[in-house]
Amino acid sequence: MDGTQDHTPPAEGLFGRPLFSDPMARALSRVGVVDVGSNSVRLVVFDGAARSPAYFYNEKLLCGLGSGMSETGRLNPEGRVRALKALHRFQALAEGMGITPLTTVATAAVRDAEDGPDFCEEVLRETGLKLWVIDGEEEARLSAQGVLLGWPGSFGLVCDIGGSSMELANLSDGAVGRRLTSPLGPLKLSGIGGGKKGLKQHIRTVMEDLHAAMDHETGKRLFLVGGSWRAIAKIDMERRTYPLHVLHEYRMQPRDIGKVADFIAETDADDLRARCGISSGRMALVPVASLILRQLIRTFRPKDITISSYGIREGMLYEQMPQALRDRDPLIEACRFAEAKDARMPGFGKVLYSFVTPLFPRAGWQRQRIIKAACLLHDVSWRAHPDYRAEVCFDYATRANLGGLKHEERVFLGLALMHRYSNKRDGTRFDDLFDLLPGPDQQEAEILGKAMRLGAMLWLQPGEQPASLTWRPNLKRLELDLSREAAPLFGEVAEARFGSLATTLGAEPQVKITR
């Protein structure tokens, strides 16, 4: 989770006290938020108090409220009717789920339209929903808070694009700093004259003004938020034949933006839409959005680019979190929540972590948190059919909604969990994903998985440490120290697993019974 600071672990044991058992966290049972944007209207219901958001329900409609507004100054009539119907539906759904009142915000289109106040009154009268019309700086703040939901302690620049506006916000040590708003939304730019040349010049002028207002800062990590950016990322995945179709934490380098912009310009839009699974309404905005992104990269010169699937709606959830929950690692909290809910022996993950850590003496804090996550998740898929359990584990790690994970870390976690249940990984349907992880890291994930596979055989009473590992790389010797109480657990299967772990390490296995 680069771009963040290392935080001192809590005092309550290796993993700290689980925040989801705290009364303040439990109060966040279900939270419903509605975002009335220039292009889409969306309802999201977050479930539970895990630090990574669990999406209980997610529905959107591309209404195009801001379509044509640059010419008329008013909300799109058809979009207005469709948005009102969607809000009727969302309110009814919320009542059925028992999550009223909904928190409902409206952004640039409603904010700037002549008939925006009239639309707000109509929504209140017809649905009972109070639309909170937020200004551009508040929109930037909430979007940046959404990024913090996935990456606490982040540094960088957040850029959120909507249909009618584009917002910027600085992040420094997990705090939202300077915020700016601009009219650089694809729908808003439809009325700019002078053809493509005039449009490019207008974008460049506005972008340079934004850069000056941000004190000409360059070289930061750029977090991209918004549907048009996600659509461009999908297209870049298609261009690169990228194997992991998870948009959150998808990384691009500045040089990639010119390549994908050219790819968009040179490829038939309908063909791209079909290949990438992008709606026609969203695809219509992509060509202009790619021009905006290209100029953004030229002007701000970021060091790298990260897609954030978390934005304004997640920022609204973050707003309601107690600070103690905000400060926790979203990955570890989500894994602890999963262990408490699904593992056969909740709490054994901490014991297992102590058991496997001697094998990784040089692991930095980023790798240590992935090892912790693996230990917490090592048993949550026990209900899966034994023939498919290893693949289910890998699929869960690589595709689940887990925050604070780079793509290569997802693959590392998935491989470790796969080897928790299987010695081999050849011939699976995930072979193309393994290449996202360098060879030495693949071996380290295999070592972790086989160590967990062994440790899972050595259960005693909850909280007890029945065995310990000592890795002596200079001697190429792996020692297993068993307590007398645990010695009967070391049967033929456990012995075979210990031997497999030693073989992967290139070590001679040695067993001691002490204590």
Task: Outline where the language-model segments fall.
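Non-catalytic pre-domain segments flanking phosphatase-related domains
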Residues: 1-30
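Helical "lid/coupling" subdomains associated with nucleotide-phosphate turnover
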Residues: 28-31, 45-48, 64, 68-99, ...
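A short acidic Gly-Thr/Ser loop motif
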Residues: 34-40, 159-165, 225-228, 309
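A secondary-structure boundary/capping signal
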Residues: 37, 106-107
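N-terminal glycine-rich anion-binding loops that anchor highly charged ligand groups
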Residues: 52-63, 67
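C-terminal structured domains
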Residues: 496-507
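A short amphipathic beta-strand at an alpha->beta junction
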Residues: 505-515
